[in-house]
Amino acid sequence: MKRNWDLIRSILLKLESQSEARGSLLPDGFTGFDSETVSYHFKLLQSAGLIEAIDYSSLNEMSLIARLLTWQGHELLDKIRNDTVWNSLKTTIKSKSLDLSLDAIKQVAQTIISQMLA
């Protein structure tokens, strides 16, 4: 399964918008994505240190609940929250024939933000 960066951004935004510090973001609340796909992305984000999640997976099914953003999760979201930055970032990376990696996203987002501030 490939990473879906739009889904990843959506997960980070939803976690940040929770009213409780230790909420419970279920994998079935994302339109257009099945629970297994969202759980997979929860697992990716957890392994990257961007979120904390609880793993309820069984041998037959992947199932996680996202709890909160980590410091690094907040740092990434601060760079990609703005729709203009996000869309420009995706266009820039695609035009350069680069893959959407976490490092590339951070670097390009910082460049775009710096250009906006200049």
Curated annotation (Swiss-Prot):
Domain of life of the native organism: Bacteria
A Pfam family: DUF2513
Xref: InterPro entries: DUF2513 (IPR019650)
Entry protein name: Uncharacterized protein HI_1406
Species, as recorded: Haemophilus influenzae (strain ATCC 51907 / DSM 11121 / KW20 / Rd)
Lineage: Bacteria, Pseudomonadati, Pseudomonadota, Gammaproteobacteria, Pasteurellales
